[in-house]
């Protein structure tokens, strides 16, 4: 999101440029508050605001109607000095152990086909944290309105990835990589408009540069979203690519790299180590929790842990990726088209698959290695 590069370039080297470099050149103040997870600092020369990264065990108190006075002060200064700004507000919500907000309204919420009944309490807490995040966004909007900045500010609210429940985060299933994104810019984006165009996080940096009137470097992987947001087109990218590694994830046992592409109505998934069992803390907890359940529930858990070399899902009819269509004769052309697109993208990215996966831990971002 901050460098404009695909996630297989997670480790940033000293010569890499990021959004602060690009926007500062055209006079912008570029700041970040909250969750950082970036390194080395010279590659990301943000102005860092010590707010928004909240303690897990308590809500931030509201004082004089506000929770984030430092963020508010930054916006006030930008308004008074008529200084254009780009501000990343990186919330930690929702994230386990899910301690923010009130879960009571969500205790009877219907579970998805991916979840198990013993997840109900955690799911209610997860939804409570989403409501808490919604409140954070609302407070930022109030700050912009207070300072007279709302009408001329492009606001994008986006989620990081799917939930931390099975078949979500740490996978390339639809609920693992599909993310919510809402954009608002009075006079530029029609309120209430929607699109099913395929977009990616790599599109954020070129979009902000375009909105600021800054040059968009050809080296960036993404494309500006402004024509799409302004309703000038209803198409963007033909494909969106995803990848996942278990290498370096706390408690992993064996490599289980995943690559995926979505195009149109179908998602194709390539599991690089199908001979291995998918193993991270969530998977091992799942086996313990389903040990005494019936065979149907055990089979669902086993499907999460043991996967075939290839998978294909109709993500419109089957967004929870329950029916693998990889062997359907009528879909072989679709499968081959997506498989070729994924292979071509991997070649472009220098991703050789299994070999890259085995070397992944040595190429992770330094901040991740330290944690």
Question: Whereabouts are the PLM-identified features?
Answer:
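C-terminal helical cap and adjacent loop that interface with cofactors, partners, or active-site loops
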Residues: 316
């Amino acid at each position: 999101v901050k460098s404009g590069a695909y996630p297989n370039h997670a480790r940033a080297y000293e010569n890499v440029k990021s959004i602060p470099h690009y926007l500062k050149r055209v006079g912008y103040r570029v700041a970040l508050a909250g969750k950082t997870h970036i390194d080395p600092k010279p590659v990301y020369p943000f102005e860092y605001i010590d707010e928004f990264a909240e303690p897990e065990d308590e809500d931030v108190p509201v004082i004089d109607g506000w929770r984030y006075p430092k963020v508010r002060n930054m916006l006030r200064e930008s308004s008074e000095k008529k200084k254009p700004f780009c501000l990343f507000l990186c919330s930690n919500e929702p994230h386990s152990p899910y301690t923010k907000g009130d879960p009571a309204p969500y205790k009877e919420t219907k579970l998805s086909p991916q979840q198990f009944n013993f997840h109900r309490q955690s799911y209610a807490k997860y939804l409570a944290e989403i409501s808490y995040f919604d409140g954070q966004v609302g407070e930022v909007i109030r700050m912009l309105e207070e300072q007279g900045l709302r009408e001329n500010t492009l606001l994008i609210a986006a989620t990081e990835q799917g939930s931390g429940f099975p078949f979500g985060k740490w996978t390339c299933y639809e609920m693992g990589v599909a993310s919510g994104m809402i954009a608002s810019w009075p006079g530029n984006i029609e309120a209430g408009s929607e699109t099913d165009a395929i977009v990616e996080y790599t599109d954020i940096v070129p979009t902000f540069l375009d909105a600021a009137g800054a040059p968009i470097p050809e080296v960036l992987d993404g494309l500006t979203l402004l024509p799409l947001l302004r309703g000038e087109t209803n198409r963007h990218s033909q494909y969106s690519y995803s990848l996942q590694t278990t290498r370096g994830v706390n408690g992993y046992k064996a490599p289980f790299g995943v690559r995926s592409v979505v195009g149109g109505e179908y998602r194709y998934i390539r599991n690089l180590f199908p001979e291995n069992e998918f193993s991270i803390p969530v998977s091992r907890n799942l086996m313990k929790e389903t040990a005494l359940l019936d065979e149907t529930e055990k089979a669902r858990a086993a499907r999460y842990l043991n996967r075939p070399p290839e998978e294909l899902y109709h993500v419109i009819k089957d967004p929870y990726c329950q029916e693998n269509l990889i062997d359907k004769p009528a879909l072989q052309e679709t499968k081959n088209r997506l498989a070729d697109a994924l292979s071509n993208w991997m070649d472009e990215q220098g991703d050789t698959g299994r070999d890259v996966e085995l070397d992944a831990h040595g190429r992770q971002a330094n901040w991740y290695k330290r944690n």
